Amino acid sequence: MGSVSVFVGLDYHQELVQVCVVDTAGRVLCNRAAGNDARAIVELATRHGDVQAAALDACCGASNLAQELVDSGWSVSLAHPGFVARMKQNPDKTDFSDARLLADLLRVGYLPKVWLAPERLRRLRRLVRYRQQLVDQRRDVKLRIRALLRENRLVSPVGVRPWTKGWLNWVHPAASRAAPSP
C-alpha cells in the first residue's frame, strides 16, 4: 500500500506516542498509540502509505524524536503548541484528537511551525538553562538567609559587605546564637 501519500500527526508523551495517519483527502487511516520509539512509529505509519510529512508539538523531548524521524528519512515539522491549541475548534483534549489535528493541519498547510534546532545547539541551550536554574537557586538561598537575619533582627557589623569572607565569618556564629534551641 506504499503508493498512497499520507501525513502523520504525533502527540508525543514520555512512554507513548499517539500516531494519526491521514491520506491526502483527510481520511483517518490509523490513529493509535505506539511506543516512544522512532522505529515503531515509522513501521506503523509506513504500513498505510508513503509518508509525505509528519508533525508533532514542540515540547520537552519532542526535538529528539523529531531528529530520529528525520534521520529515518522523514520530513518532520515541530508545531507551535500555543497556536495549535488556539486553532482547535472543539474542547475535546485527547491524544487521539491532538494527533488528528496535527496531521490535518500539516495536510492542508496550516501547521504553525517552529524551528528544529540542531542537536549541538539544543545541548548548548540545555546547558545554559541548567546554569540559569543554579544561579536562580543560589540567589533564592541568599535572599532567604538575608530574610532570616532580618526576621531575627541581626545586623551585620558596620563596613562588612554581605557575602564576603568577613560577613560569612560573622553570620555563622550570629545565626547559631539566634537559632531556637531544640
List each language-model region with its residue ranges.
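Gly/Thr-rich phosphate-binding beta-strand-loop-beta motif of the actin/hexokinase/Hsp70
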Residues: G2-D23, L102, L134
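Short, basic/hydrophobic alpha-helical segments
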Residues: N36-A53
